[in-house]
Amino acid sequence: QRQMCIRDRVLEADQQLKEMGVERPTHVFVQAGVGSLAGAVVGYFAHKYKDNPPVMAVCEASAADCLYRSAVAKTGNLVNVTGDLQTIMAGLACGEGNTIGWDILKNHVDVFASCPDWMSAKATRIYANPLGDDPRVVSGESGSVPLGFCFTALHDEDAKDLKEALKLDENSVVLVISTEGDTDPVRYREIVWDGLYG
């Protein structure tokens, strides 16, 4: 049942790209808790564009960054994160990766990112206050982190190396996945209206 739900989300994202006239994203940014959704998204796009896959980035809460730590360890095995997994990205505060998802991710992800809370909060505010004709998106903290990581790579002077490593430029077609609304409306308002974690 869960795998069908994840598959349907990925197919929906692909359909939305087609409706917008996008044949192929150059970059895919997705959040991860245990890695099931990320594995499905990455696996789908790696298979669909196997001859020229998009650059794939997986974004985790730094307090629970088990996939990031697993990638850095370079053993091929999962590394668990224990202790206090305190983060505003409650949906990503897992600390233990899914073995099936990890098998896909370790072979197809270009960048694993350990993201602080401020990065997610900033993206929550960006989604809530779009520029021009862009639609407003109500995205909770767990859903916002891929945009936060992408925005940081593009606009933070200290992240120039990251921007280059991700091969982000004016021709990039970026897909960021958000799978969460304002699951905590009070916290959402504190972030968007009051600048919490700003």
Placement of each model-derived feature along the sequence:
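Active-site-adjacent helical/loop segments in soluble small-molecule enzymes
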Residues: 3, 97-166
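Glycine-rich phosphate/pyrophosphate-binding loop at beta-loop-alpha junctions
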Residues: 3, 7-107, 162-198
